Amino acid sequence: MGRIYLDYAAATPLDERVLQAMMPYLTSEFGNPSSLHAYGQTARTAVRTARRQTAASLGAKAQDIVFTGGGTEANNLAILGYLRANCPHGGHIVTT
């Protein structure tokens, strides 16, 4: 019987094509894209390319694509975006 995994909220399988595309950046071409040195410049170029490719595949503008470090950061960004667009008078929101 094949493996059945139902907890995709916690972890998801990685498509082989994604793994192959990412391998150079996981093994040898890594760097901080905010840094000024050559490693950072290489990483910055890779992030810009990924942003353009992602935008093109979604029919969006590159400047509208935001990469986050994880689910919590992404959720907070979505909540803040909604609030800024729909609740201009301020107030408080509590999330867990």
Which residues are covered by each model-predicted region?
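Pyridoxal 5′-phosphate
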Residues: M1-T96
